[in-house]
C-alpha cells in the first residue's frame, strides 16, 4: 500500500464501537496556557473507519487522516496498538 504524501496520524483510545464499520476514537493532547504557563489536557473525538469491526472499547489505536468517507468520517484505523481484552 503506497501512501500519497504525509498524512496526519493520531494515537487515541476507542470510546465507542456500536456503529457498523465505525469507531469513535478519543485523542488527548497537552496545550500550554498562554498566561499561566500551565499545561492543560484537551481532547477531541474522531469517528474512524474500521473495516473489520476489530477495534473494541478501551483499545489504543493509531488513526490516519483520509478522504471524507461520510458526513463525519475523515479518519481510518491503521493499527490496534494495545488491546483491552
Curated annotation (Swiss-Prot):
Alphabetized HAMAP family for the sequence: Ribosomal_uS17_B
Record bears the keyword rRNA-binding: yes
GO molecular function: rRNA binding; structural constituent of ribosome
UniProt keyword Flavoprotein, yes or no: no
InterPro entries with a match to the protein in the record: NA-bd_OB-fold, Ribosomal_uS17, Ribosomal_uS17_bact/chlr, Ribosomal_uS17_CS
Similarity section: Belongs to the universal ribosomal protein uS17 family.
Family annotation (PANTHER family): 40S RIBOSOMAL PROTEIN S11 FAMILY MEMBER, SMALL RIBOSOMAL SUBUNIT PROTEIN US17M
Keywords assigned: Ribonucleoprotein, Ribosomal protein, RNA-binding, rRNA-binding
Official protein name in the record: Small ribosomal subunit protein uS17
Alphabetized Pfam families for the sequence: Ribosomal_S17 (PF00366)
PROSITE patterns xref list: RIBOSOMAL_S17
Assembly and oligomerization: Part of the 30S ribosomal subunit.
Gene Ontology biological process terms, A to Z: translation
Native source organism of the sequence: Geobacter sp. (strain M21)
Superkingdom in the source lineage: Bacteria
Function of the molecule: One of the primary rRNA binding proteins, it binds specifically to the 5'-end of 16S ribosomal RNA.
GO terms for cellular component: cytosolic small ribosomal subunit
